[in-house]
Amino acid sequence: MEKDITDYLVVHPDQSTLYRVGEEPITYAEGKLTDKAKTRYLNIRVQLEKGYLEDKINECSQPDVKIENLSKEHMELIDKMVDSITSEVGRAIVGLTVLQLTLKSIEPAQSIRLHKGSNNSNAFSWQEGVPMRVLDKNFITPVLRKYGLLKLNADGFMMTRSLAENYPYSGLYKAAIRGARSEWIEITNLVEDGHLHPEDSLKYMISSLLNKSDEFQKLSDDTLVILEKYLDSGVDYKAILTLIQEFVETSEYSARIFEVSIHSFSQALDELKLLAGHLKPLSQMRSANKKHGNIGDIEVTSTKNSLSIIEAWDAKYGKSYMRDELEEISDKLELHVETEI
């Protein structure tokens, strides 16, 4: 018998079995929730009632938010999903991904493929499922609307019929989903397989949504107006430098503000065509940059998509002992033979 070369789903009257290439088959039994599923659902509700998602949004609103367990590829995957949102499509699937990552962050044992769960014998349910529509309407959509992260109907994105078919969420899910379907499936698979950190993925997605929110854009526009007025007032560069230094020294997030300041100076050099290559954007948050192949906070690469770093600056503020920092840079340089101090 030839080896299977594609995924497939076997549907029985009381269960479904998902076969994926390179993975063990998983059977999802239908029926009323098990005691373990009830316990997980209760904990999820309790944590959401306590403001779990709002706490994550507030955490991601801070300049020093840390996201340490995502690779560059994982970040790009989430970026593609967020960037796919338009006025017409993409919002429901992003909302669903936020819901899935939230559930998995609270209860790692909960499958995020099984979107229905009930004790009602007349309703379709998986024994290890979870009622995502209920959780969405009560805890996810209201919070996303409150913070302006997604423009959603008040009834919730799970009211979309295409997300409510009685099949597990997988690459074999039959309904026509508008938006970043392939990215959603990949994220779902990675999380379920234990290859994608759900909490850090949630925080990264929230951070991306915050940066795209109308409120953030308005704040950015207002800031630029204030800046133009300040520059037109005739202030000299020494006063500007003093203002920046005072802001760094008095900020609650001095280390991060220092990084932003140095990168801002680099942007000015870049606009004047004084850099030898492409200036990489500053990371949205402070992360484990060694894992991502970075050397410093500010990096100039030979071309836009090149991994060849020709100049890097690692901003350090308030560090009295630099030996550990230098050893860390030494470790990073081992990954970049084209670079030297």
What spans do the regions from the language model cover?
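Intrinsically disordered, low-structural-confidence terminal and linker regions
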Residues: M1-P25
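Extended, H/D-rich, highly charged conserved domains that either
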Residues: T250-V260
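Catalytic core segments in nucleotide and nucleic-acid processing enzymes
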Residues: V260, F265-I341
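Charge-rich, low-complexity terminal tails
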Residues: E2-D4, R256, A268
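Interfaces and regulatory segments of ATP-dependent nucleotide/adenylate/phosphodiester-chemistry enzymes
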Residues: Y28-I240
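A short, surface-exposed helix-loop junction/capping segment
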Residues: V235-S251
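Hydrophobic/aromatic-lined pockets within catalytic cores
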Residues: L210, D214, V248-E249, Q267-L274
